[in-house]
Amino acid sequence: MPRERQKRGRRAEAKRKRDDEVGDRTAPKRQKASEGDNDFNPLHSQAKIGDDYIPLEEEPASSMDTPFYGLLDPDEQEYFSHASGLLELNQFETEEEKSIFIERVYEEADGKELKIACSQSCSRLMEKLISASTVSQIKSLFNKFVGQFLNLVQHRFASHCCESLFLRAAPYVTLEMKKKSAEKNDNEGEDSSANLRLEDLFLAVLSELEGNWGYLLTERFASHTIRVLLLILAGEQLDNPSKATVIASRKKENLDKPKVTQRDKSASDRRAVPPSFNAALEKMMNDLVTGLDNTYLRALATHPVGNPVLQVLLSVELTHLGKSKARDPDSVFRRLVPDENLEEGSESAAFIKGLFYDPVGSRLLETMVQLAPGKFFKTFYKALVQERIGSLSRNEIAGHVVARILERLSKEDLKSSMDLILPEVLSLVKRSRFTVIKTLIERGVIRGVDLRPLADSLLLAFGTDPIARINNVLKLHHLNEENDDTKRSSKNSTPEQLHGSLLAQTMLKAPGPLSELIQSSLLAVTLETLIAIAKDPVASHVLQDALTLPTSTIQFRRQITSRFSGKMAELALDSSGSHVVDAVWSATENLIFIKQRFAEELLANERPLRDSFVGRAVWKNWSMDLYKRRRGHWIAVAKGLESVNPSNSENRQPPKSNLDLARARFAEKSNTSTPKKITATF
C-alpha cells in the first residue's frame, strides 16, 4: 500500500509540473472556447475578467491545492464500515441503546472526523451519524469542521456530510431562539462546544466562504451547499418534498428518509430564524451576483450547475425579500429581465424565448412564472404566450412551462388557452405528452371551466372503443407482455405508462364526461385485464381512484366491485392488488351484501393471508378477526356506524334522520331567540 501511494504521488507531481509548463498555452484555449459561444460571443470578448468572473468551461484550480487529511487505517475502516451497517439495519431494541451506540462511535471517531468525511467508504457513516445526532453532538462536529468548510464543500464526499450537517442543525437554530435563557443555565457545566450557538456557527461558515462565492457558484459539489445555506438562512421548511430536487441532485441516495419524522414540524411554511440570518442572507445574495455582469448571469440560466443556484436565488428574492424587490434594478430578477414591456425584438423577450426550449433554462423559467409579480406575469402572458400557447404546448420542454402558466390563468384566459390547445391534443396523445392536458383538467376543475370540448378531443384521440381507449391510456399492451414473465415493479415501468396513469387519475377527478371515459373502459375490459391492472404497480392507482373518488356513482361501484368476486384472495396476496382490496372496502360502504361476500372469501383463505405480509395487512384493514368473532359488530363497522375499537364506539350514535336534523335545528333556533321581557308588577 505505501508503494502504491508513492506512485500516485509521483504521477500527480509529474502532472502538476506538466500543467505548470503548458499553463500559458491552456489559458488562450479556454478563452477561445468561451468566445466560441454563439449566444454571448460579443459580450464575452468585451467583458473584463476579474476574481469573481469564471468562464463556464473553466475547471477548478489544481487539486494539489486541496489539503489532504490522511487516510483511515484498515482496522478503523473495518470498524466504521461495520458501524455503518448496524446503523443501516437499525435493529436496536430501544432508542437509548441506539443513542449509546452513536455516542461510542463518536468517541472512536474523535480526531478522525475529517478523514471519515473525505473517505469514499465511510462518509456515508458520517451522514447517518449526523441524521441521528443530538444537538450537542451536532455542535461538537460543527466545531471540528470550522476552518475547513471551504475545502470540505468542494470535496466529492465531504460536501454531502456538510449538507447533512447544515440540514440537521437548521431546526435547532429555531429551538435555540426559544430557549435562550434556559440554555445559559443548563450549559454551565458542559464543554465549550456545547456552549456554542448554532447561529454563530452558521455565521462562521458564511464568513469562511466569503470571497469565494463567484467560483463556488458553478462548482459541481459546492453549489449544492450554497443552495442549502440559502434555504436555511431564508427559513424554508427543508423537509418539504418540493425542496428535495432543489437541495440535492437526483443521483444522491436518500439517506435522510428516517429523519423526516424527527425534524421539528411547524404549521407555517417558514421557520423562525434569527435577525442575523436575514442580514446574512441579503449579504450572501449580493455577494453571489455582485461580481457577475448581466451576460454571465444569463449564461448561468442555461448552465447545468449554476441554474439550480439561480433558481434558489430567484425564489428567495421573490418570496422572502418582498415583491417590491423585483422592481429594484439591481435585483436578480431585473438583471435577468430588465425590460418591463417585453416588446418583440427586445433583449429580455429574446432571452425568455430561448429559455422556453432549453432543457436547463426552462426550469428557471418555470420558477419565474410561478413566483413573478402579477403585473409582470400579465405582460409576459400577453406578449409572449397568449397567441403561441398551442405551438408551445407541442414542444416536450416548453410544455412544462405551459403547465406552470396555466396554473396562474384566470377562468377566461384558461378557457381561451384551452381553445388554442384543443387542436394539438391529437398530436400530444400520439407522443404521450400528457403534462399540459393533465394541468388543463386540474385547473379547469378548480376554475369551473366547461371541459366537455376537451373530453370530446380526448375521445377522438384515444378512440371511441372503450377497450382500445384504456389500452391507449395505460399502455396495457406492454402490461400483457410482461405479465407472463417476471414480476413487475414501478421502477421497471416506462415514462409513457406512468404519465398515462397520472392522466387517467386526473380524468377520474373531473366530474362529467372525462371521468366517464375511464369508468366505462374499466367496465368494458375483460376480467383478466382488470386483474392485470389491479396487480400492476402503476396502473393499479387508476383502479383505486375509480373505486374511492366522489365522482364514482354507486351504480359504477356496484358493477366494478362485483367483478372481483372469486379474485379477492388472489389480489390480497399481491403487493399492488392488496391496495385495490383495501379500496374495495371503502367502495362497498353502502353495498353491505357485496362486502360480506368478499369477507367470506377472505375468511376461506385465512391461512395464506396470515402467512403473507401484505395479506396480514388486508386481514387487519378488513377487521377479519372481528368478522370471525362478532359478526354483528363487524356489520356495524362495515356500514360505518361503529368503529373497530369498542371503547370508541360506545359513544358513537347512528346518523340522524332528516326529521331528527330538522327537530334539532328548530330546538336550536328556539333556544337562541331572545325571550320576551316580562315587567314585574308590585
Curated annotation (Swiss-Prot):
Question: Single GO cellular component annotation?
Answer: nucleolus
Q: Name one GO biological process term.
A: endonucleolytic cleavage in ITS1 to separate SSU-rRNA from 5.8S rRNA and LSU-rRNA from tricistronic rRNA transcript (SSU-rRNA, 5.8S rRNA, LSU-rRNA)
Q: Where in the cell is it found?
A: Nucleus, Nucleolus
Q: Where are the Pumilio repeats?
A: 108-143, 347-382, 383-419, 524-562, 563-600
Cell wall biogenesis/degradation: present as a keyword of the record?
no
UniProt GO MF annotations: RNA binding
* Classification via Gene3D superfamilies: Leucine-rich Repeat Variant (1.25.10.10)
Q: Where is the composition biased (Basic residues)?
A: 1-15
Q: Which PANTHER family match?
A: NUCLEOLAR PROTEIN 9 (PTHR13102:SF0)
The name this protein carries in UniProt is Nucleolar protein 9
Recorded name of the encoding gene = NOP9
